[in-house]
């Protein structure tokens, strides 16, 4: 470091002008060298910076291209930076080393300096390079730090992305589960709503059931109350019934309620063993009428009728044929009383009111004519025919009027046999007295024996007459009913024909019972029983035909009841005229002769009856077609019956008329039956006034026998309850035919109960016919009186039982 001191010494030495010029030249050279060195340094720095920048850009691009090689890039970048830093340093040192000789040479050349100058220049350059190197290193460190931060950031970002994907997946799963839960929630909400609705409905039903329960409770209480009231009323009614029964027992009335064929309970009143007073006062009758239609009213009515019948029978016994007018008056009273009973139907009452003017005369005529028939019977048949007309007038009353006439007989029959016995005995006594006076044939039997035997006889001819006599009745019915319609003169002719035919009919009927009596003793009961068996066979033939058309008969009866009443009135007038006309009287001998003649032809008659039974069917059909022309029927039938000695035409016509009457109206039957009744009553004159009513009853029995032909056909057939009821008075009789006839009658009564008035009319007519027939056969063998009497009795009994059915 001696250079400055030497220089100063030199300057001091060179104070001369020359010395000064040299010094200036040296300073200028130094300055020029320093300026070049600065420029070189600046260029070096710029180049290094450019290289570093390019390296940085390249590194960044590499990092962005592959994240997986990020670590490698980082390492590579760090290496590259180190290399870059090394390179410039080497380059700088090399350049510096290279430039230094050139500068030094230039400076030296320019300055002409020495080694001292070179040394000073070297020191300044080394200081500048060290400073730049330090700056470069700092920059590299900053770059490395920046790269590290970037790598950490990228790793965090990647982790965030992974976690985000996981969260998204979890979110999706949560959303699905949430939707499922929402669906389940809606389902549960719906179920809750439905359950709430069901709960409301159940609550409503519960409320309704409670309300119904309350209503049922109230109803139950009301029913309980009504039940208690009804129990109380029932007890009261029971007590009243007991009192009524006590009163009935006190008065001797016994009520037997039985079920009729139609299902209704018919109160048949049997006043057994009780004998009522002989007379009924008006007060008692009014009381009985006021009782009403109840069973008690009917019972009292029946009792009154029974008493009336008993009174009539007793009076007839007391007042014989000599007091006929008196008996007629009593019968009229009975008829009037029976016409308006409380128990009768309103139709019967109306009809009785309509026919009231005829009742008295007709009833009187019946009994009067019956008495006359008893007296005149021994005398003549022509007289019988005339009386037949009178009896026809009697039979002419309306169906309704005839109904009350017969009930008296029926009720007397119901009295248990006591009244019937009285009445029958009365009739028997009358017949005996009259027969003693007229026929000189005394009764061989006591009243009891006559009663039973006559039952046999009576019922036998009833059955026989049921077929033949009843057919005759119906024939007369058809003739008279049809003919009065056309011409009154013709009706008179018909009446004459009836008289003639009635005489023949009585002969025929006499023949039948005579035939039965011929094998046995005429006065014995055996003959009677034989009669019963014989006629029963005849009846069976005739009955089936009648059985065929009961329904038609009922309908026609109702339809023609009105017309029949008018026809009957006309017939009555004509018959009354005929009745007035005197008739020659035949002696009893003539009658017997006629009967014997008929007996000879009995076999023919029976055969003809069988033929007639077949003819009836055809005749029934013909009559159904030609009901308006009964005359033609009668003519055709008469032609068929020509074989019969006396009454062939009448028989066939009668049988055909039976069927015709079934088809036609009961009213016509009543008219014709009434005529035949009168005719037969004349023939049976010995039966007496009582016989007329009983004959009517027998006619009822005949009608019943027709309808119930099956029961009559087998006389030994078991009896129905109705038959037992009817045969109560007849069980005393030994023969079963009687009971069978009663059975048939009772059954017919029940069947005909719908038209009681019509059945009664038929019964009246048929009874009169039967009584005439019975009286005729009785005359011949000498049993005339007992047979006629007991026929009347049986007829009365049967008629009464029938009327019981009709009343029910």
Swiss-Prot record:
Residue ranges, compositional bias (Polar residues): 527-543, 755-769
Origin superkingdom: Eukaryota
Phosphoserine sites (modified residues): 16, 115-116, 120, 124, 555, 564, 581, 618, 638, 714, 733, 766, 768
Tissue: Ubiquitously expressed.
Compartments it resides in: Nucleus; Cytoplasm
Phosphothreonine modifications at: 676
Coiled-coil spans in chain: 128-250
Gene Ontology biological-process annotations: negative regulation of transcription by RNA polymerase II; regulation of transcription by RNA polymerase II
Region (DNA-binding) location: 485-584
Pfam families (UniProt xref): LRRFIP
N-acetylthreonine: modified positions: 2
Record field: compositional bias (Acidic residues): 670-683
Comp. bias (Basic and acidic residues): 41-58, 82-97, 471-499, 506-515, 603-619, 646-658, 718-734, 780-808
Keywords noted in UniProt: Acetylation, Coiled coil, Cytoplasm, DNA-binding, Isopeptide bond, Nucleus, Phosphoprotein, Repressor, Transcription, Transcription regulation, Ubl conjugation
Molecular-function annotations in GO: cadherin binding; DNA binding; DNA-binding transcription factor activity, RNA polymerase II-specific; DNA-binding transcription repressor activity, RNA polymerase II-specific; double-stranded RNA binding; protein homodimerization activity; RNA polymerase II cis-regulatory region sequence-specific DNA binding
Annotated segments matching region Disordered: 41-126, 393-415, 461-808
Bias type Basic residues, positions: 567-581
Family membership: Belongs to the LRRFIP family.
Role, per record: Transcriptional repressor which preferentially binds to the GC-rich consensus sequence (5'-AGCCCCCGGCG-3') and may regulate expression of TNF, EGFR and PDGFA. May control smooth muscle cells proliferation following artery injury through PDGFA repression. May also bind double-stranded RNA. Positively regulates Toll-like receptor (TLR) signaling in response to agonist probably by competing with the negative FLII regulator for MYD88-binding.
Protein name: Leucine-rich repeat flightless-interacting protein 1
Upper lineage: Eukaryota, Metazoa, Chordata, Craniata, Vertebrata
Gene of this entry: LRRFIP1
């Amino acid at each position: 470091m001696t250079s400055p001191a030497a220089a100063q010494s030199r300057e001091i030495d060179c104070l001369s002008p020359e010395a000064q010029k040299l010094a200036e030249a040296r300073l200028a050279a130094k300055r020029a060298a320093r300026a070049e060195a600065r420029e070189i340094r600046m260029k070096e720095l710029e180049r290094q910076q450019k290289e570093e920048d390019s390296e940085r850009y390249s590194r960044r691009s590499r990092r962005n291209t592959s994240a997986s090689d990020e670590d490698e890039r980082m390492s590579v970048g760090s290496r590259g930076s180190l290399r870059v830093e090394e390179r410039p340093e080497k380059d700088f040192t090399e350049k510096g080393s290279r430039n230094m000789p050139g500068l030094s040479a230039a400076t030296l050349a320019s300055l002409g300096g020495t080694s001292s100058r070179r040394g000073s220049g070297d020191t300044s350059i080394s200081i500048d390079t060290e400073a730049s190197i330090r700056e470069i290193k700092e920059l590299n460190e900053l770059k490395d730090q920046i790269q590290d931060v970037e790598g950490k950031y990228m790793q965090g970002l990647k982790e965030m992305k992974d976690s985000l994907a996981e969260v998204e997946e979890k979110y999706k799963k949560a959303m699905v589960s949430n939707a499922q839960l929402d669906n389940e929630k809606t389902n549960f909400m719906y179920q809750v709503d439905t359950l709430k609705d069901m709960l409301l409905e159940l609550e409503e039903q519960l409320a309704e059931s409670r309300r119904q329960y309350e209503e049922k409770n109230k109803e139950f209480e009301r029913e309980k109350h009504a039940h208690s009231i009804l129990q109380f009323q029932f007890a009261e009614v029971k007590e009243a019934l007991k009192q009524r029964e006590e009163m009935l027992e006190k008065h001797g009335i016994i009520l037997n309620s039985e079920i009729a064929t139609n299902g209704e309970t018919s109160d048949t009143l049997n006043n057994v063993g009780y004998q009522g007073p002989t007379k009924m006062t008006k007060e008692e009758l009014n009381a009985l009428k006021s009782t009403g239609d109840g069973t008690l009213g009917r019972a009292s009515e029946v009792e009154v009728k029974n008493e009336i019948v008993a009174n009539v029978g007793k009076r007839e016994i007391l007042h014989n044929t000599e007091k006929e007018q008196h008996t007629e008056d009593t019968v009229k009273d009975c008829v009037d009383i029976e016409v308006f009973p409380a128990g009768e139907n309103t139709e019967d009452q109306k009809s009785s009111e309509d026919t009231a003017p005829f009742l008295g005369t007709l009833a009187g005529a019946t009994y009067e004519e019956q008495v006359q028939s008893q007296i005149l019977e021994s005398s003549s048949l022509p007289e019988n025919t005339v009386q037949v007309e009178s009896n026809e007038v009697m039979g002419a009353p309306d169906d309704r009027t005839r109904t009350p006439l017969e009930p008296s007989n029926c009720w007397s029959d119901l009295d248990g046999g006591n009244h019937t016995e009285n009445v029958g005995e009365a009739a028997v006594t009358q017949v005996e007295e009259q027969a003693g006076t007229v026929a000189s044939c005394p009764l061989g039997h006591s009243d009891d024996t006559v009663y039973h035997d006559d039952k046999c006889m009576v019922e036998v001819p009833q059955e026989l007459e049921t077929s033949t006599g009843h057919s005759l009745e119906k024939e007369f019915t058809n003739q008279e009913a049809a003919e009065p319609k056309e011409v009154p003169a013709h009706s008179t002719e018909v009446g004459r024909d009836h008289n003639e035919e009635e005489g023949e009919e009585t002969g025929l009927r006499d023949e039948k019972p005579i035939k039965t009596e011929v094998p046995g003793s005429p006065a014995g009961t055996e003959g009677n029983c034989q009669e019963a068996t014989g006629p029963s066979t005849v009846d069976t033939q005739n009955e089936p035909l009648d059985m065929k058309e009961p329904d038609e008969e009922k309908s026609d009866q109702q339809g023609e009841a009105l017309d029949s009443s008018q026809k009957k009135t006309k017939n009555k007038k004509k018959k009354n005229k005929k009745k007035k006309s005197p008739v020659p009287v035949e002696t009893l001998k003539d009658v017997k002769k006629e009967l014997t003649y008929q007996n000879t032809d009995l076999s023919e008659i029976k055969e003809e009856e069988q033929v007639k039974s077949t003819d009836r069917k055809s005749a029934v059909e013909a009559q159904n077609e030609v009901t308006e022309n009964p005359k033609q029927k009668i003519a055709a039938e008469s032609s068929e019956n020509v074989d019969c000695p006396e009454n062939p035409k009448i028989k066939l016509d009668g049988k055909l008329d039976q069927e015709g009457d079934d088809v036609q109206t009961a009213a016509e039957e009543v008219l014709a039956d009434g005529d035949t009744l009168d005719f037969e009553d004349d023939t049976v004159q010995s039966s007496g006034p009582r016989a007329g009513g009983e004959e009517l009853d027998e006619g009822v029995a005949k009608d019943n026998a027709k309808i119930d032909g099956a029961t009559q056909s087998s006389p030994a057939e078991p009896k129905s309850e109705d038959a037992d009821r009817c045969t109560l008075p007849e069980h005393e009789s030994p023969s079963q035919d009687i009971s069978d006839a009663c059975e048939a009658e009772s059954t017919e009564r029940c069947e005909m109960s719908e038209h009681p008035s019509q059945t009664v009319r038929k019964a009246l007519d048929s009874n009169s016919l039967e009584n005439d027939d019975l009286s005729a056969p009785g005359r011949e063998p000498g049993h005339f009186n007992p047979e006629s009497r007991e026929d009347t009795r049986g007829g009365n009994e049967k008629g009464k039982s029938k009327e019981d059915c009709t009343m029910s």
